[in-house]
Amino acid sequence: MLEQTDLSLEQLLKNYYETTNEKIVFVNRQGKIIAMNDAAKDILTEEDNYNAMTNAICHRCEGYSNEYDVQSCKDCFLETTQLQHSNFQVFMKTKDNEIKPFTAMYQNIDEQRGISAFTLQNVAPQIERQEKMYQQKMLHRSIQAQENERKRISRELHDSVIQDMLNIDVELRLLKYKHRDKVLAETSQRIEGLLSQLIDDIRNMSVELRPSSLDDLGIEAAFKSYFKQFEENYGMHIKYDSNIKGMRFDNEIETVVYRVVQEGVFNALKYAEVNEIEVSTHSDGKQLVAEVVDRGKGFSLDHHPKGSGLGLYGMRERAELVNGHVNIETHINRGTIITLDIPI
């Protein structure tokens, strides 16, 4: 039952026909286009209007598919009766020669007069959204698999390789003290030094891959371990400020924060030309905010340093996986501020 209005059903339908983005074309039993709304003229030109046969539609059609398979012109929807009163997907070429996907319906609306209606709804935006969601899903799986593999290799290096090398070191020391030979002692001493350096390198590699403290103790412990190692390796001081002492977050959030800050710190090392980097992590219970600040060279976002583009892009991609946002503020000769904001 229609609510009483000043407009009749006929007027309401007329208004819809004239204002909708849906493309509506009426065709008679001879295949002539007898009417179309303004929206349809994005596909069918004025020259096609009213006097043209259905081949006007055919010339714009780039193929269609039903629920089972991709169809060809041989099984044209304008000829088959199987698609009456059903939805299907069709690809049409616009006046600008762009090929766009549409959800279409072709149905007989007046059997006595042989009039059929052909309607098109542009589904390109929905398909784009679906593709983006699919890409994010695949990215999420890829990053998750990468982190799991990093964790596995890191644990293997720490629990197996380093332990075996420590056992070799012990055996080497025993050999040195067991045989009082000057040449052997000097050689053993030199090998011990090389072995010790190799153990340190593998420990650093294990932490770089994925620190066990990130999974066991959380962000703050992982950062303290990483910053200490970073200062020892590169001689750059990191000033760290935080109010999240002992707080734990979702494992995926902690991983994103760690990786984004790690990338920000490493970019500052490579490009900022500074002796100190400031890092902060703060939470108010609703948001988790991490910041990496350097007072160095800065750069133009339009012409970022060579090699940094993928890193900056990767930060944003990772942040999006946890509904976060990365903002980069930079000024030439004034430095760069990278801010990660994640709802929790």
Curated annotation (Swiss-Prot):
- Its main subcellular localisation, reduced to a broad class, is cytoplasm
Top-rank EC class of the record's enzyme: transferase
Q: Which Pfam families match?
A: HATPase_c, HisKA_3
Post-translation changes: Autophosphorylated.
* Entry-linked Gene3D superfamilies: 1.20.5.1930, Histidine kinase-like ATPase, C-terminal domain
**Cell compartment(s), UniProt:** Cytoplasm
Protein's name according to its UniProt entry? Oxygen sensor histidine kinase NreB
